[in-house]
Amino acid sequence: MKHYLLAAPLLALALPLPASAKTLTVAAGPDAQTRLQEALILAEPGDEVVLGAGRFVLIDGISLDVDRVTVRGAGMDTTVLDFTGQRDAGEGFRVTSDGVTLRDFAVENPKGDGIKSKGADDIVYHRIRVTWTNGPAATNGAYGIYPVESTGVLIDAVTVSGASDAGIYVGQSRAITVRNSVAEANVAGIEIENSRDALVERNFVTRNTGGILVFDLPGLPVMGGGNVLVRDNLVVANTTPNFAPPGNIVAGVRRGTGILVMANDGVWVEHNTLYDNPTAPIMVVAYTQGFDDARYNPYPRNVTIGANRVDRGGTDPQLDGAAQLLAAFGGALPPVLWDGLAQPGATALRVEPGLAGWSLNLTEQGKGLGEANPGPLNVPTPDRTAMLTGVGAPAALEARLHP
């Protein structure tokens, strides 16, 4: 027995100890492509890849598939990953691992998406900038910040401009926070698509075609979007002409749309400031096209428009019969537009008393606006007992903002 007792601590000493986290530093300059990708490959869980100040000229996309790695630059205006000469058409930076933190650097002019994270749970984007420096163009990449198929997404203090689909896009994901960010001169500023438990707050969304979009679309592996809270955002002057490539779903977004909710269940929109969104400050609609996916519900359900501050909206609607509509409503359309479509037996929309609205009074989903019969909005008031719960990224992600 004594021999066994002595052997146990000796055996423990012989076992390999976990390696301590290390820092891999990469400077800008010659061979940055090779040195940066090598660091991302050699990184181990818990490591930090530190990017120095300067411009990293990259000709191919880079990727990370190691869990719990932090990639940190010297600042979104100081460390720049420059993909202007990118040879392939993929994303600039691709992440496929869990627990990753991306912070304090910029991505410029990728041929495809800026940063795409797929199946990457508990990811943090902090003080990241993605820019297409030539301004709005259909040839720009589709998405700036693009997490998809993930649980636990925190996007904080990022800036995106020039995306030909959405600046900040979160798709087929759960437990999401998008906050304190700037989305400017994209087709859609912020888009939450086929996702649940999302919090979109304190963002500045301006000069896009449409400001904040909450969509649910058919034909995707994950559907049933909802439980989304959109609050305390500044949604201003979303007046950029639509520059999405033909065929994209956002190519149908009308210039001058502030907040658009389509085919979601349980969306609460309140305490936002909407100014100079000339088609509609707030729009709630069913899916606009035909579909053959039996799993899909095309109608908005349980959407609540609470108290929002709205000014100078609906003054130049990009809608058929705009002149007649403006005349009927005294020169500007009311702040809330509903297409009038609802799932039988369900409440599509509730609106705060005193916030005027109007309905297209459509009678059939997917048939366009030809049968519209506009009239005043007549819907119930908000039910405060049904306030949303369980929205936002996990609290554990917050600690990674302040290491």
Predicted regions and their residues:
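Right-handed parallel beta-helix/beta-spiral solenoid domain characteristic of secreted/periplasmic
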Residues: 22-34, 48, 68-112
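Acidic, glycine- and Ser/Thr-rich low-complexity intrinsically disordered tracts
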Residues: 295-403
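The right-handed parallel beta-helix/beta-solenoid scaffold, focusing on the short coil/turn
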Residues: 22, 47, 54, 60, ...
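Short, T/G/N/S-enriched strand-turn elements that build extracellular solenoid repeat scaffolds
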Residues: 36-42, 57-66, 71, 116-119, ...
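Right-handed parallel beta-helix
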Residues: 74-77, 98-109, 121-134, 151-164, ...
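Extracellular beta-strand/beta-solenoid scaffold signature
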Residues: 33-37, 59, 83-93, 109-116, ...
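Sec/Tat signal peptide C-region and signal peptidase I cleavage site
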Residues: 17-21
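Bacterial N-terminal signal peptides
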Residues: 7-16
